[in-house]
Amino acid sequence: MLSKNQQKLLRALAQKKYRKQHGLYLVQGAKNVQELLNAGKPVKQIFASADFIAANRALLEPHELVLCDEAELSKVSTLVSNNAAIAIAETEPQAELNTSGLVLALDDVSDPGNLGTIIRVADWYGLRQIVLSEHSADHLNPKVISATMGSFARVDVIRTDLCTLLSTYDGPVYGAFLEGQSVHATSFATRGILVMGSESHGISAAVAEHINQPITIPAFGGAESLNVAMATGIILDNMKRHG
């Protein structure tokens, strides 16, 4: 059963200021909690239904566990439907950026759903790190974690000033624009940085100054634009096939 203090903490961690204050974040739903545990991430506490505990006993064994009924879990979860498990995980120190291979950098991508999907896409294509500009969405937002479908546990997120990073980088910097060289005709290097811009404004002018390989996804129909997560997947697919 959830105590009042536990309920209060779970609700508080839906907000960025309390995640930062406590150094904790929420992982919700059976799939995401399983991925969290499989990755060996630091966990403070797990709240779970009897069915989830029975199905994941070995994974849960080392952790502090609170048995809850499904109604309790649904009541405190930020998800529309979650009656299996919620974990309180500990925020880890930011990883060191590795620029020896392909790096994906997001310039002010502010929509949590898009960011979560991009993390999932990056995981699909084998990227172990993503760089976020300082004004991109919080990658520990519950909506982001949920949208990753477990990929948050395998992809490190590094938040930094993109202009500073790009100004000292000595490899190709690809940027997605409405105009540029077609991704189908670009010979991608195995080492490089791909910059994707925000949903509403694209790549900022300050960041664009550091891009030396502007690229575009050619359109064959009448749609005005592509969702940034969809566009990221298309470009990464071309980079992996031609790089």
Regions found by a protein language model. Name each.
Residues 49, 68-69, 88, 133, ...:
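Generic beta-sheet signal
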Residues 175-223:
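Active-site/ligand-binding-proximal alpha/beta "capping" segment
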Residues 87, 123-125, 136-153, 205-243:
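Structured adenosyl-cofactor binding patch, chiefly the S-adenosyl-L-methionine
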Residues 65-90:
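Glycine/small-residue-rich loop that forms an oxyanion/phosphate-binding "nest" at active or ligand-binding sites
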Residues 1-53, 136-137:
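Boundary-proximal intrinsically disordered activation/regulatory segments immediately upstream
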Residues 25, 107-108, 133-134, 220, ...:
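Glycine- and other small-residue-rich loops at beta-strand/loop junctions that grip anionic moieties
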Residues 38, 96-179:
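RNA substrate-binding interface of SAM-dependent RNA methyltransferases
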